[in-house]
Amino acid sequence: MAKQVLTYIDAKEFAYIIDSISVLVEEANFLIRNDGLYLRALDVSRTAMVDLAIPKESFEEFPEVEELRFGLNFKELKKLLRRVKKGDKISMEFEEGRVRIKLIGKSVRSIVVPSIEVVGEELPTPKVVYTAMVKAASDVLATAVKDADAVADEVKFEASEEALIISASSDKGEVEVKLDKNSELVYEFDVKEPASARFSLEYLVDITSKTSKISDIVTIELATAKPIYLSFDIPAGGKISYFIAPRVE
């Protein structure tokens, strides 16, 4: 295969994206199609899924291929991305069996890593009929989840016609964050019928803290006792989304 190059203009933003994916998985397969870059991966417990889609137009350089698959170990990649400086670009050069990753700024730093094949089945999009959608400030969600983590190992999301309530309780205490539909931190609010579900905080704390560095806005979709859907728009285009299974009462 001839060398193909993928270049993203904001390496720091790309580092945040990789951080947000690595909350769930240590390695994963990427797919380049002629319209964009994609990733979909399931955690080892099969209770959480991450979905990444970045359109071709978001890249400075993009491979001229119909389809290209490559797998990366995020531990090795994050070693390089820790050295990202403001204004750096990141490029990936794909050769047979390996990927040369460069940080391009005042200097060029690079590593060469193997393109691994991560074994796993094709993952369909979960079929959930959601009854509540709230678009709100992502840092509010991150703070609410962090507060919940201080007192419990699970958090409850409740959507009514008037508000979204995020709460947690245990012997350590109680926490409640209420987002009224008319709050200045709520940008869209559509509740067709009330919904509530409980979720483990195992991933939610890291997901919300890391993705709030990417996007100022989060879209939350709920249905009673169904997986929660969290979606974060990427400034350059595209989005990173999560499905997290509920805890059964």
Curated annotation (Swiss-Prot):
One of its GO terms (molecular function) is DNA binding. Disulfide bonds: none annotated. Sliding clamp subunit that acts as a moving platform for DNA processing. Responsible for tethering the catalytic subunit of DNA polymerase and other proteins to DNA during high-speed replication. It comes from the Archaea. Pfam families: PCNA_C, PCNA_N. This is DNA polymerase sliding clamp 1. Homotrimer. The subunits circularize to form a toroid; DNA passes through its center. Replication factor C (RFC) is required to load the toroid on the DNA. Gene3D superfamilies: 3.70.10.10. Keywords: DNA replication, DNA-binding. GO terms for biological process: leading strand elongation; regulation of DNA replication. Belongs to the PCNA family.
